[in-house]
Structure formats: C-alpha cells, structure tokens
C-alpha cells in the first residue's frame, strides 16, 4: 500500500472525540442510563477516552464495556477456520440503558451490524447509538452513525487507518491507497 495523506493528527482526534462526547450527552439529555461499548480493537480506547471526557465536563462516570463481534461477522468463512475470538466484557446490565457503540471507522456497515447482533444477544437496551471517529462512506447495509468525528469520502481502493496511542503508540488517522489500484 502507498501512503496518501494524514487525515487527522493527535490534537484533531482529541477535539473530534471531545465534540462526540458533548453530542452524546446532549442526545441522551445527560448521563442518566448512559453506557459506552467499544468494539474490538480500536473502538475500545476511543470509548474510554469519550467516557473520560464526559466525566471531565459532567462530573459523572459513564460505564464502558468491551465487545468482540468475531462470531457475529457475516464473513467468517472468508477470514479462516480459526478466527481470533477476544473478550467481551460488559460489567453492567444493558437492559433499559442508552448504549453508545464506539468504533474507529464506519465503512460498509457490516461491523456495526455484527455489533448490534452481539449486543442484543446480551440484553435489551432502551436505545443504541453508533459513534465513529471516521465515516468513509460506501455502505452496503442501511446503517448510519449518530456521532461522527470526521466524514472522509474515499474510493474503494483506499484504506483509512486509525492509529491510537494505546494500541499503535501514536494518535493519527491516515489514508492509504491499495497497490495496483
């Protein structure tokens, strides 16, 4: 792959997540009954950051859970016979809560669909929102994000890479082009 552009640097990511945190609290009319669930892998640190921002300006802790969607994917046969299943840890009851699913990039909508299926198997939330750092378009399913850090129109031969300090050692969003495209 060939690097094309930096889409967001660390301060821009921070500002986008801070704005998303405010939008979540506004949409929910406060923090009552609110919880965040990060989708493996990079949705987890993003969810924790949003929760920290909410605690900063609201003075209330919002619970954060971790969701693995591996077994809910519709492309399991394409990713091999031994998919890497990771931990799902949701230390609170989902029933009656407003849940914000957090992911790094929204593309086809298939990850979000799998996350919805996994979440609903664990309880019956009052409402489910979707928050993403980057929405790159090209939906294959009728899914949209409620909270978006940045909309980035892309072509199908481009790849959006989100890097987070907790996983990758730096905060940055990059646009790459597939070779031979």
Curated annotation (Swiss-Prot):
Cystine residue pairs: none
Record flagged with keyword Glycosyltransferase: yes
Keyword terms of this UniProt record: Glycosyltransferase, Repressor, RNA-binding, Transcription, Transcription regulation, Transcription termination, Transferase
GO molecular function annotation: RNA binding; uracil phosphoribosyltransferase activity
EC number: 2.4.2.9
Swiss-Prot/TrEMBL catalytic activity: UMP + diphosphate = 5-phospho-alpha-D-ribose 1-diphosphate + uracil
Top-level lineage group: Bacteria
Protein family per UniProt: Belongs to the purine/pyrimidine phosphoribosyltransferase family. PyrR subfamily.
Protein name: Bifunctional protein PyrR
Lineage of the species this protein comes from: Bacteria, Thermotogati, Deinococcota, Deinococci, Thermales
